[in-house]
Structure formats: structure tokens, C-alpha cells
Amino acid sequence: MSVNDQITHIGKTLSTTASAFLNYQKSNSNTQDVLTNNGPYKNLLSNTVNNASSTSYFYKRTEHGRFVKNASNTFEDIYSKTRRGDVFRNKFTDNKTCFRMLTYISDDLLNEIPTKEGLKSDADGKLLTEGGENENLRKNASKKETSLFQGFKSYLPIAELAIENTERLNYDTNGTSGTVGAKDVMSKTNERDEIHTELPNFQDSFLIPPGVETKKISSSYSPSALKSFSQTLVNSLEFLNIQKNSTLSEIRDIEVEVENLRQKKEKLLGKIANIEQNQLLLEDNLKQIDDRLDFLEEYGLEVIEANSDENAEDDGMSERKALKNDAIRNEGVTTESISSEASNLPPRRRQQLRDDNSLNRLGAFYSKSKKRHRKSFPTFQQLYEPGTKIGSIMSTHDDFLTCLDFDAPFGTLCTAGYLDHTVKIWDLSKQNKIGELAGHLATINCMQINRDYGTLVTGGRDAALKLWNLNLAQQLYQETQNLTSPTNHIDSPCVHTFEAHTDEVTALSLDPSFLVSGSQDRTIRQWDLRSGKCLQTIDLSFANVLTTSTNVDLSKSTLLTQRNERPSIGALQSFDAALATGTKDGVVRLWDLRSGKVIRTLKGHTDAITSLKFDSACLVTGSYDRTVRIWDLRTGLLNKFHAYSAPVLSLDLFQENAAVVVADEPSVQIYDSEKDESWSCVEQGNETSVSTVKYKENYMVEGRENGDVNIWAV
């Protein structure tokens, strides 16, 4: 197409477009249909396309989405420019004029910027002032949304400070141009991060704007100078207000992000909890299968499996026959038949028969094949903030809890209460009752769980020590709850009873192979778990040296009013051949069980010792003298001690040089001797005192005077 034809088309285009808009003003039709409904305009558009030969003409002018420069350089494409000056270079005018034309924004367009309320700026067409705002907009700045220009201006000082700090970091203070080491790069990076974090802290640099001096304000007599100062301060106030609103907006964005992260964390916590629940379920099923296999093997109830599925019905009949025959064969060893046969024997022979049966079961129970190893351990408690209450079990017993123990976080819990002769078993994950152990004739004072074998050892005021099978107890309890006729088990949950003490058992410690017990009869006994025999007895003839101290307020402690006498042996713990005991005279003694003699004595308490725990480095003791003392086992010296307002009733080792302490108060105290600080796990509104506590793997369970149990993450 020639140049004349192009000029002709331009003239037709202008006249057609003008006539279309003139007709639009007269007809008041829809704005969007002004040109599309105009016939001459559509014909002109069609002729333009036809004169271009084809639509490929337009595609020929492009390359990878951009228009390419033709030979005549009449088409200007700013994306194809390689230098800044080429953007404004053309054949029609100079660069300065082109720049002004391309960057010009009329006042009408600026006044058409919508505000937050949907209203437009003043329509008087006034130009923006030096401050960058319309005068009327400035008066209502606090009521309207901050503009992009204002926000940009408010952050200019921050950008300048960042550039200044970056240049300072990049400057080589040694004046050398050598290679910078990796450590220098890391230190500079960390320093940049610190500077970036501290950028919003303007401190004193923006309190007084430049050009305003407080001394001149108080001494000036020039109205113009004072007005100038006033205008500068007003502008600075507006600037700070914009900056404050922008910062508040950032804070709101951060709060939204934090809330989103919190919700995401809660979902992930729920996922972990679900995974660990499934792990516990699978562990329980594995344990149940192992117990069933041991039961079938022990009593010869295995049935030969069929070789094909076709004989399944016959196999079922043969299995029932085999069970019937086994029941007939073993009829003589059932509980009822044993009783009938034993009734014809002398009393001494009857007791011997029962003892032999118990010892055989004890030896078989502690065989190596019975030892259980968990495939997984819960870690969910580590995700809680320390001091968070995980859950609670209400009214486990009618009176205060005398002792409790659990095998693992979210595992199995056993509790005993005052004047309650039974042990109750609880599921810590579901927080419900799953079993019960009956057999003691008086209050149970102490207990300990062996999670490798799934056993519990208890000591009571009936002078008896009992070893329980927790798995069997749960199975029997489940059968009872399902209202099914319980299997006529030869076994009972009580595997063995250790009887030798002549007074109540006050403390015990369970080792992999041995059991050590302390009694009010002033003796310590060491038992073999596989044979049930007492290996040695240590007589504590000194236990009556200390009488009841008058320093202790007996009316304050619920335990003391119901237990009027201090225990002769308040606490003990054994590990291999080492034994630590805390007695009524307030002295801690370290024993060698191989010789049965004291190898070290730790003196410091002024009243009976109630609890103690030790590890490889330290020993922690609690006493009725209202103190907790931490001893160095290597030197035998006292490291730290901490005083409380009430007698210390129970404690457990939290970590090295730290302990979880119960001091007859509504809260559990965690005392860290290295940091010399103490913090508490307290339930708001609960004034019931804590009587006993156990801690394992950031998981703490405490029992209270009203029978409640609370579970904490620490």
C-alpha cells in the first residue's frame, strides 16, 4: 500500500469514528456497541484487512510475540530496543519531546483515582502540591486509604538505610582486594540479616525532622519562620501516620500468616497423633498374638492346620474335638480340680503344692522368649509446649492416690488409692479404664512397671509383694466388659506373691533380674524374679533413732494425718549391685548388694526421707523437712538444695541436676539446680494438693488427693 493510500485510510478512519461517536451522543445507545454496530466503520475495518493481503501480514510483522523492526523503521516497538536512548528515538520529534509525551499524565486522570469510599477526588482540576497530595485530600488523609505514592515515599528512608548498610558491609576495611573466605561471607550474610531485621527500628533519627530546631522555636520572633516550622512538623506527622498505617498493615499480614501456620501445625499434630494411635493399636495386636501363642504352647492346645481349604469343615470339627480332649486331659489341673485334690492333703502339703505351681509359672514367665520389645515409642508429647496439660482422668479412686506408674507416654497407667485394695489400669491415650487387679488385703503403698515383660510389682500394707501380668489382666477385664462368659483360665493376673516381710511394704525397686523391697519391719530384702526366692535380708536396726519431728505441721498434710507414723524406709532405688536408701533418720545410704554393706552415707536432711532418684552422676532426695537436695555421687557432696513451704511427698528425676517435685501443693514444681530456677505445672482453679508423680520422656503424670489424675507435657 502506498503512502497516499495510507493517508486516505487515516482520513476515512477519523471521519468514520467521529461520525459514529456523534451519532452515539444523539441516540444514547450502549457505549460498548458504538463502533461494532456502525456499518461504515465495519466496512473500513474489512477493507483494511483485505488491503493487508491476508491476516498473515500481521503475523509476519511479529517474531516470538514481538513486532520486529521493518526496513522503513516507521513502527516503534519499545521491547525491541537494546539501549535506553532508543526508546525515545524516532523520525518525528526529538527525544526530550517524546519522553514528555510518553510520560505525561493529565490532571484529570490523577483526579479520577478512586478512594477507599469509592468517591473521586476533587473535580476542580487542581494540580498535586509539592507534598504529592491534593490539599483537600491532605486534610482527610487520616480517613482515607494510603496511596501507593505515599507508601513509596514513606519507605524511601528505609531503602536509603539499607543501601548505606550494604555498602558498608561490602567495603573492605583492610583495604585489600584479596579473596573473601567462606567464614567472612557467612558473617557478612548474618550481619546483613541482622541489619534487615533492625531496619524498621528508626529510634531517634526521625523524632525531629530536618530544618526544625527546638531552640529556635522557643527564641524566634519571626511568624514566617514559625509557620515554616509548623508546616514541616505537620508534614512529618502525616509522614509518620502513613508509616504507622503501613507498619500496621504488615503486622496484620504477619498475623494472618501466623494463624495459617498455626492451623497447619494443628493439622500436622493431628496427623502425628493419628499415626501414633495406629502404632499403639498395632503394638497391642502384636502383643495379643504373642500372648495367645504362648498360651497355646504352654497348655498344648495347638491344632494341626489343614493342607487344603476343602477340609476346613472337618478341621473345625477336629479342632473342637481336640479342645474337648485337652480339656478332659487337663481337667485335673484346673483351679476347681486342684482345690478338690488339695482338700484331701495335709495343710502343709496344700501350701507346698500352691507354691510349686506359682514358682513354675514365675520361671516360665521370665524366660527370654517372654521379653517384649516395642517397635515404636510415642514422641507426640515432645511437640507440646512445656507445662501444657495434655489430659486428665477424673476420680480414679475415692481417696487420695498413694502411688502410680506408667510404662510409656500415652501407654498404660496403673494407680492405687488410700483404703482401696485394688490396682486400676488405664489407657493414657484414650484416658479410660482397661483393667483391674484385685488381691491385696490392705492399702497399696508402692508400685513399679516393667514394660519389657508387661508386668507390675506392688507392695502393700498387708506385708505382701505381688507380681502381676498386665496383659492378662486387660484381657480378662475386656471379656468381663463384653458380657461374654470368661474363659476358665488356669492363670490369674497375679503371677507370684513374695511373702517374707512382717510389716507393711513401704518402698520397692525393680531391676531386670532382681526386686528390692523395704518394709516397716526395718528390713530390706532382695528377691530373685525367676525363682521367687529371697536372696538376702539387710536389717536396719538404726531405723528407730529418729522420732516424729515437731517441726512438721501434721495438720497441713493429708497424708500425714492418715499415716501417723513416718516410714522406716521411705524410699529406695537399685541398679545392678548399687542400692540407695532413704530412711526415717533423714540419712541417705549407698549400699553394695554383693556384700550387703554401706559404702557411703549422705547426711543433711533433718526429717524422714520420702523419695529419692539417682542416675549416673547425681542423686536427688526429698524429705518431710520441706527440702529437695541434689548430691554428687562421685564426691558424695551436696550440690544444691531447694526449700519448699510444705513437706516433699514425691519426686522423680527430670534430667541431670533437675527434678519433678510434689510438695503437698496444688502444683507440681520442676526444679533445675544448674539454672537455679523453678517453674510449675498448675491447673487454674484446682486447689487440690498433688500426692504423687511420675515422669518419663517429657511426659508427666500426677495424682491428687481427690483421686484425679492429670497428664502434662514438660
Swiss-Prot record:
The keyword Mitochondrion applies. Residues 332-343 have a biased composition (Polar residues). SMART domains: WD40. GO terms for molecular function: ubiquitin binding. It is a peripheral membrane protein. The keyword Ribosomal protein does not apply. Belongs to the WD repeat MDV1/CAF4 family. Changing residue 440 to E/N: Abolishes interaction with DNM1. Interacts with CAF4, DNM1 and FIS1, components of the mitochondrial fission machinery. Interacts via its N-terminal, coiled-coil extension (NTE) with FIS1, and via its WD repeats with DNM1. Changing residue 605 to E: Abolishes interaction with DNM1. This is Mitochondrial division protein 1. Residues 240-298 form a coiled coil. It comes from Saccharomyces cerevisiae (strain ATCC 204508 / S288c). InterPro entries: G-protein_beta_WD-40_rep, Mt_division_protein_1, WD40/YVTN_repeat-like_dom_sf, WD40_repeat_CS, WD40_repeat_dom_sf, WD40_rpt, WD_repeat_multifunction. It holds the Pfam family WD40. Keywords: Coiled coil, Membrane, Mitochondrion, Mitochondrion outer membrane, Phosphoprotein, Repeat, WD repeat. One of its GO terms (cellular component) is mitochondrial outer membrane. Residues 323-354 are annotated as: Disordered. It is found in: Mitochondrion outer membrane. WD repeats lie at residues 396-436, 439-478, 500-539, 561-603, 604-642, 644-681, 685-714. Signal peptide: none annotated. Involved in mitochondrial fission. Has a partially redundant function to CAF4 in acting as an adapter protein, binding to FIS1 on the mitochondrial outer membrane and recruiting the dynamin-like GTPase DNM1 to form mitochondrial fission complexes. Formation of these complexes is required to promote constriction and fission of the mitochondrial compartment at a late step in mitochondrial division. The modification Phosphoserine is found at residue 376. Changing residue 148 to P: Abolishes interaction with FIS1.
